[in-house]
Design a protein with these regions (language model features):
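Conserved catalytic-core segment of nucleotide-activated headgroup transferases in glycan assembly
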Residues: 69-72, 79-207, 214, 264
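Catalytic binding pocket for nucleotide-activated donors in carbohydrate/polymer assembly enzymes
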Residues: 24, 153-315
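Short amphipathic alpha-helical segments and helix-helix/interface helices
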Residues: 9-15, 36-40, 122-126, 151-152, ...
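Short, glycine/acidic-rich beta->alpha junctions
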Residues: 6-7, 28-32, 143-147, 209-213
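A structural motif corresponding to the C-terminal end of an alpha-helix
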Residues: 14-21, 125-136, 220-224
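Short catalytic/ligand-binding loop motif for oxyanion handling, primarily in non-cytosolic enzymes
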Residues: 2, 31-35, 55-60, 82, ...
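Membrane-proximal basic amphipathic "stem/tether" segments
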Residues: 306-370
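Extended catalytic core of nucleotide-activated donor transferases of GT-like folds
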Residues: 1-66, 81-87
Length: 370
């Protein structure tokens, strides 16, 4: 099947391949699940980085694979090239000719109601907005998609942009949702999404939460384009009214959304908040991600766990009060380390207990001597 990762069987059997720590990054995990799970087990993958939220990682990967370490990651981070492009192309608001822009494309019905939001927000916005003072450039056709530098120029020319959470609301772990959907459409080729959803898809809806912040949010923040988004969690990164103007999914607050957008002071504050927190902070840069990634490997490599942990503590605890972001990540990492499936936990419980005591002792020492 397309998008399937395959490795030469002989290569996977090599001794060094089996003994070397292996890391896999996954996105678009809502289909081809069985192939992915088999790949992890057959290839002896040790680390899985996934867009599945932390609370569901064990349900999907912990119970179905032998991977030792499971981590949530984003679909993308802030590249230096994005910042450079934004700095070169960004326009003052009064020089942008498009008030609100958007691009999307239809997704298969079997991806669920969440996936249909990507076109629905644009379709309903066009239908419901009756404001002659707004210049809209909202299109949902495959032929209307924009790529590369042209996409950056488009964002730079928009004062605002619509958006929804990335991901889907149906996580088709065994492929049955797709199969039933396709079978129904074969018999009813003109069926609407609502008809197909009611007939076969409803039981699969929202069983696994698989929604995430889109890289488009970072792009809009970098170009200082105001985001008008459907309400959502956005990985806890975006806050409504602070980083974006929240639009209810039934459009019941559309008038208030437009009022806020037309309020230059409020709109500019939202834009600046998004830029400072998502871009200028560096918190979501690839550089920061790689630093955290390296920390993870150092802490969890099989050789000399204790020595590496002590070294990390010496380096990080001294900066305890200066790098609050590191504390947040460190605690999150420790929580991830103690969340393998219970059947694999027994052999490690004494070690984790000792590590926890060591950490608490060092934190207590630093707090007392600060």
């Amino acid at each position: 099947k397309k998008n399937r990762i395959d490795l030469n069987a002989k290569y996977r059997d090599e001794k060094y391949w089996k003994e070397t720590p292996k890391i896999a990054f996954f996105q678009d995990e809502y289909h081809y699940c069985e192939e992915r799970l088999n790949f992890i087990n057959e290839s002896n993958i040790n680390y899985v980085y996934s867009c599945v939220p932390e609370r569901s990682l064990n349900e999907i990967y912990g119970k179905n694979t032998n991977a030792e370490f499971l981590f949530e990651s984003l679909t993308g981070y802030v590249e230096d090239s994005l910042i450079a492009s934004a700095n070169a192309l960004r326009k003052p608001f009064d020089q942008r000719s498009i008030d609100i822009g958007y691009r999307a494309r239809p997704l298969p019905y079997y991806n669920g109601r969440g996936a249909q939001e990507k076109t629905r927000i644009g379709e309903q916005f066009i239908e419901l907005v009756d404001d002659p003072n707004l210049e809209l450039d909202i299109k949902m056709g495959e032929e209307d998609r924009i790529y590369g530098k042209d996409w950056h120029r488009f964002i730079a020319n928009c004062k605002g942009m619509l958006g929804v959470e990335a991901g889907t609301s149906i996580f088709d772990i065994d492929g049955t949702a797709e199969a039933k959907c396709n079978a129904y459409l074969a018999q009813h080729p003109d069926a609407s999404f609502e008809e197909v959803h009611e007939a076969v898809l409803e039981p699969y809806e929202d069983k696994v939460f698989y929604r995430t912040i889109s890289p488009r949010a970072f792009e809009c923040a970098a170009f200082k384009t105001c985001m008008i988004l459907f309400e959502g969690s956005y990985n806890g990164i975006l806050e409504p009214h602070k980083h974006y103007i929240p639009l209810k999914k039934d459009f019941s607050n559309l008038d208030q959304v437009l009022k806020t957008f037309h309020d230059e002071e409020k709109r500019n504050q939202i834009v600046e908040n998004a830029y400072e927190d998502l871009i200028a902070s560096g918190e979501y840069s690839y550089k920061k991600f790689i630093e955290d990634f390296d920390t993870t490997l150092n802490l969890t490599s099989s050789d000399s766990w204790k020595d590496r942990l002590k070294l990390y503590l010496v380096e990080q605890m001294l900066g305890l009060f200066k790098k609050l972001g590191q504390i947040k990540y460190f605690l999150k990492l420790i929580l991830n380390l103690v969340r393998p499936p219970l059947e694999r936990l027994e052999m490690r419980v004494r070690f984790y207990f000792a590590v926890s005591l060591f950490i608490l002792k060092n934190i207590s020492f630093i707090l007392k001597n600060k």
